[in-house]
Amino acid sequence: MRQNFEQIRPMLSDKADLLQVDALEAWTESSFARLQPLLDQRAANGSIRECHGDIHLGNATLLNGDVVLFDCIEFNEPFRLIDIASDAAFLAMDLEDRDLKPLSRRFINAWLEHTGDYAALDLLNFYKAYRALVRAKVSLFRLGQEQQMGL
């Protein structure tokens, strides 16, 4: 996560934006320290698995009434070998980002009922924040590229 903050900061110049990034980084660091025992436990109990790695609405479709995911991250194993709760949190974050919070809650409730992984509840906000941070970083990279191209 630190790498994301290191990459984002140079792309920002507005003092309010930088203060917000500082606050998010402080929250992230304290949350990580608080959650470390649970993260270690999940690593030991098999919750870290090869996952999709990029579950958001742009990588999902309905096919014959079933949700089908596509375009998983195949090019980078560390992006795929993640906590299964991180994969679920990405979709929840994407739904919330699109003002679909009730659908996000329904998804998380169904996911919890299906997996029984209620211990993951303590991690969801942390993982959603991580995924939102990555999305912000990618958006800033794209904006920088567009500005360089004069778009």
Where are each of the predicted segments found?
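ATP-dependent phospho-/nucleotidyl transfer catalytic cores
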Residues: 1-56, 60-151
